[in-house]
């Protein structure tokens, strides 16, 4: 039996804005009581603000038991992992990740319009979406092991951990629930 309820709320901004939005939302008594027993996931990328490590500390120390689902450096890092393994020893700068997206999508510019387009994720996943998602999850696990072996931890070392994604845990859980419910 599964009881997953997803209620996405868009904070429209960087990690600090996501945190502030969640804190303000949960300060309201009606929201605090309604979501008391819910898992509260904060989904963000780590390219902004510059003090991302301090923001992560605030999130962890808030008392609202947030689960942090991040993509470092960009959300596109996670998307690229669906069609290519990323390695920490290589160039994983914003410029490189955006170029990989541009090349894969066969566009001359990777604009906000393309980024927000409903078809973009479909183009990345193609007809074998489940395989690509599972491959991205495995890539994320390899990166996680790499950083663990180096003694790095998101709570204190996120700025040194590029690329790294933790959102895979939420995605994997959702996929497993779908498989469980659908057989």
Q: At which residue positions do the language-model features occur?
A:
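Eukaryotic endosomal/vacuolar membrane-trafficking regulators centered on PX-domain-mediated PI3P pathways
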Residues: 15-19
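C-terminal accessory helical subdomains adjacent to catalytic cores in phosphodiester-
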Residues: 2-9, 23, 28-183
